[in-house]
Amino acid sequence: VPATIVRATAFFRSLVGQIDRVKAGKPFLLFGNGELSACKPISDRDLACFIVDQLDQHREGTVVRPIGGPGPAIAPAAQAAMLCSAANMPLKTRSLPPQMFDWFRWLLTPLALFSPDFAKRVEFLRIAKFYATESMLCWDHENQRYDADSTPEFGSDTLAAFYRAVLSGSESPPERGEHRLF
């Protein structure tokens, strides 16, 4: 049975966690130098259109379709600049060591042996470190690196325009659920 697995590189909704911090005049938090990871975020609307377009594709077997939004890959340092600009706030950042996730995991792991709640927190910290340090782009196996140029782009919605819409109130901030760092 033919199937298509769609793997979005990042979602706008996963990049809204620091809007309130920036609006309050607090620094945008970066891990390391803010260039450890990058992504090509895609809007829900553009992703929905991409998925619908896949329905017309005829193929045999299962295919995996990575997809990102339009434009160049965006690192957290560039996200900070976009968000501060959209909020009409000066660019202020604070760098945190990504190793902090390991430090907290080491502290909580003994408690995780006895508590499912702490076990969930330890797992969350493992996942958070991954997202803080690994790019959400296509992997170039030959060169052993993430490759923004080989990550397909789709749509027309940009993260900068999304930030402006949320900050102006013309678009509601998306629900992020329980798995959020900020």
Located regions from the model:
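A hydrophobic C-terminal alpha-helical subdomain
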Residues: 99-182
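Context-gated lysine
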Residues: 23-26, 40, 92, 105, ...
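Oxidoreductase cofactor-interface core, primarily capturing Rossmann-like NAD(P)-dependent enzymes
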Residues: 1-89
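A broad structural signal for alpha-helix termini and local helix breaks/kinks
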Residues: 83, 87, 91, 114-115, ...
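C-terminal "lid/loop" region of Rossmann-like NAD(P)-dependent oxidoreductases
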Residues: 64-65, 90-103, 125
